[in-house]
Amino acid sequence: MKREMRQDRKAQPKAPINENISAREVRLIGVDGEQIGIVSIDEALRVAEEAKLDLVEISADAVPPVCRIMDYGKHLFEKKKQVAAAKKNQKQVQIKEIKFRPGTEEGDYQVKLRNLVRFLNDGDKAKVSLRFRGREMAHQELGMELLKRVENDLAEFGTVEQYPKLEGRQLMMVIAPKKRK
């Protein structure tokens, strides 16, 4: 059962080619993209065979269906290359996290701020979390002040996507990078 499912997942809908085209008449497009016109399927197959290429159904929804004379293997290869190139150029946005404490000293604050700036410049989102321990929960306003300071310091690099909210003993805020022009 699993093996069958695995094969189904790989199977991609392929365009009907040559004898697999069921229409009687087709609108034929030549090798160089020129319109040949509406011809019978037998005539279209003969023209494709003379050119030693395949007859590929491009648009099955049209009446009559649109078919093109091309090298189908080369067409699949080009399509695969385009998909790979598009995938390669796509950047996966990650969420990077920096953790603060209510008593974070100035030196540590500057280091963490520098890292946040780097994350935002790289195009990643930044999650700023502030953890309270023990009796620090009584002074949540200190945490809010710290997150406001982070927000102000990062104003030129990013915008707040999720404003500070308390979840258990943690205050969290998400900052997204500004769109580049």
UniProtKB/Swiss-Prot annotation:
Subcellular location per the Swiss-Prot or TrEMBL entry: Cytoplasm
Major subcellular location class: cytoplasm
Keyword Magnesium found: no
Keywords: Cytoplasm, Initiation factor, Protein biosynthesis
InterPro entries for the chain: T_IF-3_C_sf, T_IF-3_N_sf, Translation_initiation_fac_3, Translation_initiation_fac_3_C, Translation_initiation_fac_3_N
Listed GO MF terms: ribosome binding; translation initiation factor activity
Domain of life: Bacteria
GO CC, any one term: membrane
GO biological process: ribosome disassembly
Family: Belongs to the IF-3 family.
Assembly and binders: Monomer.
Free-text function comment from the UniProt entry: IF-3 binds to the 30S ribosomal subunit and shifts the equilibrium between 70S ribosomes and their 50S and 30S subunits in favor of the free subunits, thus enhancing the availability of 30S subunits on which protein synthesis initiation begins.
Stated name of the protein: Translation initiation factor IF-3
Source lineage: Bacteria, Pseudomonadati, Pseudomonadota, Gammaproteobacteria, Pseudomonadales
